[in-house]
Design a protein with these regions (language model features):
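Alpha-helical structural motif
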Residues: 4, 8-12, 22-28, 117, ...
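A general structural-boundary detector
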Residues: 46-49, 108, 126, 154
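Short, solvent-exposed segments of well-ordered alpha helices
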Residues: 49-53, 112, 158-161
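Short alpha-helical patches at coil-to-helix transitions and adjacent helical residues
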Residues: 56-63, 114-118, 164
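A short hydrophobic/aromatic micro-motif that marks alpha-helical segments and, especially, helix-coil
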Residues: 73, 106, 146-147
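A contiguous pocket-lining binding segment that forms or flanks enzyme active sites
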Residues: 82, 94-130
């Protein structure tokens, strides 16, 4: 509902302010998220949360799940939770402006970029705020092995050196394939 979406939007903004509020450009980032219609985009055209506001809900699901993984799993106990939160909230920013509403009410995804969406999100975010190395790695590698076989050696090294990246990937998979699956 509209009320639920308003509450989700407020929660998202509160968490984003908590994560990046003191960084140069954070207010510009908040305004850009409004302008690019982040809060009304679907999360996917074919799979999870193919509805207006789906990207907002997905980003919150990933953020909540990632923080819970940091809290409950010893493997993530030493993660920089601020980096995890920042990366979780912003990992799919590049999806904005790429969905076309179809006559049947669904969406078609149109991506003309030559980069993967991890890289594209990192580049777009850094137009407004500086990301830490951990945030960059987490966002860049959040797709895990879905980026393709050529990346598998590097992916393993990234996850060994940056548990924040593995945490974000796991949270994204839990949100996408468990929490957001229609029954």
């Amino acid at each position: 509902t509209t009320m639920d979406k308003a509450l989700l939007k407020e929660e998202y903004k509160r968490l984003l302010r908590q994560a990046v509020g003191d960084r140069t450009g954070s207010m510009a980032l908040m305004m850009v998220l409004e302008e690019v219609d982040f809060y009304n985009c679907p999360a996917s055209a074919k799979h999870h949360l193919n509805v207006p506001g789906g990207l907002l809900l997905h980003s919150l699901n990933v953020a909540r799940t990632a923080l819970e993984l940091c809290e409950k799993m010893p493997q993530f106990a030493k993660c920089d939770t601020n980096a995890v939160l920042t990366a979780a909230l912003l990992h799919d920013v590049c999806k904005t402006g790429k969905y076309i509403k179809k006559p049947d009410g669904g969406y078609q995804y149109r991506d003309t970029e030559l980069l993967g969406h991890g890289e594209e999100s990192v580049i777009r975010i850094q137009n407004w705020i500086h990301l830490t190395d951990k945030e960059i790695l987490a966002i860049r590698w959040h797709m895990g092995a879905y980026t393709g076989e050529r990346d598998w050696n590097t992916l393993s090294k990234v996850y060994d050196r940056c548990p924040e990246a593995l945490c974000l990937h796991m949270a994204d998979m839990i949100a996408t394939h468990i929490m957001e699956v229609e029954k």
